[in-house]
C-alpha cells in the first residue's frame, strides 16, 4: 500500500511526495499514543466485537490483545449486566447517539481471573466518512483500589458516628 501511495503522490505534483511519509508517521504516532496511554483504549465495531485493545487494557483486564481481538465485550461484562448493556449498545449503534455523551460512567467489569473490577470510562461514537456508525471507542480506568478505599472510609465514618452518638447518649 505504501508503494502505491508513493507512486500516486509522485505523479500528483510537487509537495505530495511527502504525503506517504506523513501518513506513515501519523500511523506511528497513533500507535505510540494508543500503546503509551495509561488508560485502557478499546474500540468495538457496530456488532460489539473488540477491534482495538491496548497494553493498558491487557494490564487492567488480564486478557492479551490476541485473546481480546474479535471477541464480544461479554469478555469483560458481568453476566448480570449483559442484557442491559447490549440493549443500550444496539440502540446506540442504530441511532448513532449515546445517551451518556461525555459523562464518566462507573460500572463493574470482569478480570480474566474472575475478579470483579470497578471501572470508570467514557465512550465516543465512531463514524465512517459517510457518517455511518462504525463502532465505539472507550477509554477505561481501573478504579477498584480507589473504590475499596472509599468503602473503607465510609465504614470508618459510620463507626465514628455510631461511637459519637453512643457517647452522647451516655452523658
Describe each region flagged by the PLM:
Residues 1-14, 88, 158, 162-171:
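Non-catalytic regulatory/interaction regions at protein termini and inter-domain linkers
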Residues 24-46, 101, 165:
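Sensory modules in modular signal-transduction proteins
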Residues 30, 53, 61-63:
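Conserved hydrophobic/aromatic "anchor" residues
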Amino acid at each position: 500500500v505504501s508503494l502505491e501511495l508513493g507512486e500516486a503522490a509522485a505523479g500528483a505534483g510537487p509537495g505530495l511526495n511527502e504525503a506517504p511519509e506523513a501518513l506513515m508517521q501519523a500511523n506511528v504516532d497513533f500507535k505510540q499514543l494508543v500503546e503509551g496511554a495509561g488508560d485502557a483504549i478499546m474500540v468495538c465495531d457496530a456488532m460489539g466485537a473488540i477491534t482495538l485493545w491496548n497494553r493498558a487494557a491487557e494490564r487492567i483486564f488480564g486478557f492479551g490483545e490476541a485473546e481480546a481481538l474479535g471477541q464480544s465485550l461479554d469478555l469483560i461484562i458481568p453476566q448480570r449486566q449483559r442484557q442491559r448493556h447490549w440493549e443500550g449498545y444496539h440502540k446506540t449503534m442504530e441511532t448513532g447517539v449515546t445517551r451518556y455523551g461525555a459523562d464518566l460512567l462507573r460500572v463493574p467489569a470482569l478480570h480474566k481471573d474472575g475478579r470483579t473490577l470497578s471501572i470508570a470510562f467514557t465512550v465516543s461514537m465512531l463514524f465512517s466518512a459517510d457518517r455511518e456508525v462504525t463502532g465505539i471507542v472507550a477509554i477505561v480506568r481501573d478504579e477498584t483500589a480507589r473504590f475499596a478505599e472509599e468503602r473503607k472510609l465510609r465504614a470508618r465514618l459510620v463507626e465514628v458516628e455510631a461511637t459519637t452518638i453512643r457517647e452522647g447518649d451516655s452523658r
